[in-house]
Every structure is written in structure tokens, then in C-alpha cells.
Amino acid sequence: MSPGRTDAPPPPPLPFVDEHTILVAADVEDVWWALAEALDWAFSRPSAVRYAKLVGCADHTAGGPRPPVAGETAFPGFRTASAVPPRELTLLGRHRFSSYTWTFRLDDAEPGGGVRLRAETRATFPGPVGGLYRLLVLGTGTHAKLTRRLLTTARLLAERPWREAPGETQAEAPAEAPGESPA
């Protein structure tokens, strides 16, 4: 066996918590970029940084490339574990009360077209304090509400009738929305 290599199997996945789904009337590339924008929006607020610090997350600031790249992109409370553009993004995190993953999957919606955006949460909550934390986060519906809000934000961003192309600045963007003619 070479140094640094182990033949141990990967750890089993964390226990399933929930999955939320939303249909998006846009192509998969637009939904991928919208998901990245929605994550940036949700985790760029000072309250997200304060919360990540309060519960003891290793990652409590946003950083790295956008859209997310595995091992290089972080959000408060999360690090990007894997990214398969434009189909799957897995974020992982850990703090004093929980270890968790949040996996976003983008599937073609049949037969009407568009994209099915899914958010799957897996987590463990060790010990009595972890159990109390689970009750506070899951039992109150807070996690479900925030997940649905994030998915709705991604849908609204992806379905905008006009938006800048990735990497395009406001100065380079056309003055009118597609389909409009100047007056």
C-alpha cells in the first residue's frame, strides 16, 4: 500500500433528514447559475456569518470561486464537497451539534421541460445537546422553511426574462430586455 492511501471503504452516508423539490421553467445551465447566486445571497448576510461562528463551524466566511468548485468554495457553515456542473452540488459542514450534507440535484423535468431542482439534507445530531439542536432546527420547521426559500429564490432567478450572462458586467449588458426594441 502506498503512503497516504487506505483501503478502507468510504464512510456510510449520514442519515436522511428530508428532501425538497421545485420545478423551474428554465434550462439546466440557467438553474445552475441561479442556484449559485441564491446560495451567495443566502449566505452573504452578516446573520449567516454570526450564526456559523456561534455554533462553531470551521467555515464561517464565504470564499472561493463561483459557481462552486469542489474543495475550493465555502459558505458560512459549509464547504463544497463535490460539484458536477450543471447537475449536482454537495455542501458539507460540521459544528458542535451536528454533521451534515446538503445535496442539490438538477434533473430534467419530463414531459413539460424545465428542471427539477432538489435539495436533500442528511445529518447526524450526536448526544443530548445534538438532539436538542435537532428539535430546534427541524422540529420548529425552520430548516424546511429556509430550504424552500432558497429553492424559490433559485427558481425566481433562473426564470427571470433577462439577466446578465455569466461573467458579463452591467456596462456590457444590453440596455433593453430581450424582445424589446428601443423607443
Q: What role is predicted for each listed range?
A:
Residues M1-T61, A183:
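Hydrophobic ligand-binding cavity/cleft-lining segments
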Residues A25-E29, S82-P86, L106-R116, L156, ...:
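A short, structured loop/turn motif at beta-sheet edges
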Residues V31-L35, T80, A119, A154:
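Hydrophobic pocket/interface hotspot
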Residues V17-E19, F75-P76, S98-T103:
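Short, surface-exposed coil-to-beta transition loops
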Residues R96-R148, A154:
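Beta-strand/loop substructures that line and gate deep hydrophobic ligand-binding cavities in soluble
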Residues H60-E72:
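Short aromatic-glycine motifs in intrinsically disordered, low-complexity regions
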Residues E164-E168, E172-P182:
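Intrinsically disordered, low-complexity segments used as extracellular stalks/linkers
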Residues R66-P68, L89-H95:
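Short beta-strand segments that buttress and anchor functional surface loops
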